[in-house]
Amino acid sequence: MAIQRTFSIIKPNAVKKNVIGAIYNRFESAGFSIVAAKMLHLTREQAEGFYEEHKGRPFFDGLVEFMTSGPIMVQVLEGENAIQRHRDLMGATNPDNALAGTLRADYADSFTENAVHGSDSEASAAREIAYFFTENEICPR
């Protein structure tokens, strides 16, 4: 297995619930190293830029509204097969379909307010990490 990096967001609803520490504990318990992290409040322009690939879809405006509704945590996780393992830990996008014990089963409120985001491919991970972090902000451990 290769060591990979993946990008992760703890979304506004999970930040508001004060479960950042619980989610970070789950990341570390699953064998991920958190190699970069910061809290920020997205502007509309930042959210639209990040979700550019979804522009024109029916859920786009609601997604942007939600992602700008409060602070988020963005982080880079590192570990073996990190992209797929992080997606498995998150659970299904729709929390109604998420397996028990996944982050979305435990912390999501709805399809849109689904608590967390994670990269779905190496290309997405590279783009998403670069959107929020410079190489100097990532500290391999």
Swiss-Prot record:
SUPFAM superfamilies reported in the protein's UniProt record: Nucleoside diphosphate kinase, NDK (SSF54919)
Coiled-coil annotated spans: none
EC number: 2.7.4.6
Pfam family name, one: NDK
Predominant location category: cytoplasm
Binding site for ATP: 11, 59, 87, 93, 104, 114
MF GO annotations: ATP binding; metal ion binding; nucleoside diphosphate kinase activity
InterPro entries, A to Z: NDK-like_dom (IPR034907), NDK-like_dom_sf (IPR036850), Nucleoside_diP_kinase (IPR001564), Nucleoside_diP_kinase_AS (IPR023005)
Keywords: ATP-binding, Cytoplasm, Kinase, Magnesium, Metal-binding, Nucleotide metabolism, Nucleotide-binding, Phosphoprotein, Transferase
Active-site residues per Swiss-Prot or TrEMBL entry: 117
Location within or outside the cell: Cytoplasm
GO biological process: CTP biosynthetic process; GTP biosynthetic process; UTP biosynthetic process
Domain of life: Bacteria
Membership in a protein family: Belongs to the NDK family.
Protein's job: Major role in the synthesis of nucleoside triphosphates other than ATP. The ATP gamma phosphate is transferred to the NDP beta phosphate via a ping-pong mechanism, using a phosphorylated active-site intermediate.
Quaternary structure and partners: Homotetramer.
Name the UniProt record assigns to this protein: Nucleoside diphosphate kinase
